């Protein structure tokens, strides 16, 4: 039996710029209920590994009796393996949810203290092969940008003098590894029953041929709603956290600067393309999926400076949403705690997860203050952060009913509604 956790919250919409080479491949408008409705299971930050049990660690992360493995260069991937071990049952529960016809993972397949290895990636990929429905995946910062950190194995060698991480933790090399393993065919999802989507590798602007590298950026239509994914990693959009391991020193390197600038530009063009497609097809809403929680003051200081490089994405999203005029939902992972609200409206209602496995409570702070926009705000926007990293494992069931037009709340907007599900 599944436990459904109630929530309470708000929503958004966008702009139109028809980019060259708009591909129409694989964007059939799925109707899984015969009446236009469909539902997705959305989650992230799993399978995760808890931090070592210390006085400072959250009490739910490594409970007494957990099989925590010390961080040792000569040992297996460090961390608590319980979520990996629980993943088959979780996948089975999602498969048995008769309402769900598509799965979305918003990134982070291991913790910020786990090694970045081909073997670990393969283990997760093998587990995911049991999803019967299509699986759309967006890589998180722990899979690539943070691989250079020593706590993820960056620059760390074992007793044989070998680097424990793939490519010594080189971020670009690890993103290439993730692409080769999880995106072997552009425009095709994971899962046993794959479906076609449109990838930026297929529908890139010919004026910017390097955009074809971003095979992980996709869009697709589902029940008259356009979904678009963008590779925006958590932390600082990979701009402020220096690549300090492997071949990189203690200052920002040219490869790091180039990577962030090129990806940011490609993402913004992709977002414009997606909204143009949504307007062209008469979509009733747009759902934006990215890993980063761009409003999260994560304790890395100075906090506002650390998230300042998300400004181009938020400004573009706000402008496109206002122009679109219909509901726009952004779904993020990254910060681990379920959150529902509209950070593009000052003092908007907001709810946040107050403890593992519990319902929500009003937010203590206003995310609008970190990226303030427009005197009148963007009322047709809503942002949802899905739960992750801790037990119990859960997913958010996102239901689309194109016949509905819900007022903005903590658990619905436009044709979209959602609920937290603990299998």
Protein language model annotation of sequence segments:
Residues 7-16:
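Bacterial N-terminal signal peptides
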Residues 18-23:
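Sec/Tat signal peptide C-region and signal peptidase I cleavage site
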Residues 24-119:
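N-terminal active-site segment of His-dependent metallophosphoesterases
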Residues 45, 107-108, 140-141, 291, ...:
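Active-site glycine-centered loops adjacent to acidic/histidine catalytic or metal-binding residues
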Residues 61, 115-263, 337-340, 345-401:
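Extended active-site neighborhood of metal-dependent phosphoesterases/phosphodiesterases
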Residues 87-102, 221, 228, 242-345:
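His/acidic metal-ligating clusters that form di-metal
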Residues 382, 390-423:
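A short C-terminal boundary segment appended to hydrolase-like catalytic domains
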């Amino acid at each position: 039996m599944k436990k459904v956790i109630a929530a309470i919250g708000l929503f958004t919409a966008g702009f139109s710029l028809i980019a060259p080479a708009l591909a129409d491949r694989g964007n059939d408008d799925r109707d899984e209920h015969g009446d236009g409705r469909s539902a997705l299971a959305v989650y992230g930050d799993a399978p995760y590994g808890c931090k070592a049990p210390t006085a400072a660690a959250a009490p739910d992360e490594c409970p007494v009796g957990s099989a925590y493995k010390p961080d040792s260069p000569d040992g297996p991937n460090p961390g608590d393996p319980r979520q990996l071990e629980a993943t088959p049952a979780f996948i089975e529960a999602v498969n048995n949810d008769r309402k769900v016809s598509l799965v979305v993972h918003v990134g982070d397949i291991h913790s910020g203290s786990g090694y970045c290895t081909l073997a670990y990636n393969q283990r997760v990929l093998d587990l995911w092969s049991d999803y019967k429905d299509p699986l759309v995946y967006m890589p998180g910062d722990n899979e690539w940008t943070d691989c250079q950190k020593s706590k993820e194995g960056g620059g760390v060698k074992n007793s044989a003098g070998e680097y424990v991480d793939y490519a010594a933790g080189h971020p670009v090399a690890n993103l290439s590894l993730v692409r080769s393993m999880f995106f072997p065919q552009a425009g095709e999802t994971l899962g046993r029953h794959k479906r076609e989507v449109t990838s930026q590798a297929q529908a890139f602007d010919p004026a910017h041929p390097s955009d074809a590298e971003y095979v992980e950026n996709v869009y697709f239509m589902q029940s008259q709603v356009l979904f678009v994914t963008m590779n925006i990693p958590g932390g600082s959009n990979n701009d402020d956290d220096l690549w300090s391991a492997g071949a990189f020193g203690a200052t920002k390197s040219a490869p790091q600067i180039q990577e962030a600038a090129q990806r940011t530009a490609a993402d913004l063009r992709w977002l414009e393309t997606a909204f143009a497609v949504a307007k062209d097809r008469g979509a009733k809403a747009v759902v934006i999926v990215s890993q980063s929680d761009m409003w999260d003051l994560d304790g890395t200081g100075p906090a506002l400076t650390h998230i300042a490089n998300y400004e181009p994405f938020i400004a573009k999203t706000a402008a496109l949403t206002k122009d679109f005029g219909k509901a726009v939902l952004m779904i993020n992972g990254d910060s681990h705690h379920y959150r529902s609200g509209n950070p593009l409206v000052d003092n908007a209602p907001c709810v946040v997860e107050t403890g593992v496995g519990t319902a929500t409570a009003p937010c203590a702070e206003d995310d609008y203050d970190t990226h303030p926009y427009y005197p009148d705000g963007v009322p047709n926007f809503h942002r949802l952060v899905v739960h992750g990293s801790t037990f119990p494992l859960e997913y958010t069931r996102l239901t689309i009913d194109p016949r509905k037009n819900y007022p903005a709340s903590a658990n619905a907007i436009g044709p979209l509604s959602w609920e937290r599900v603990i299998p």
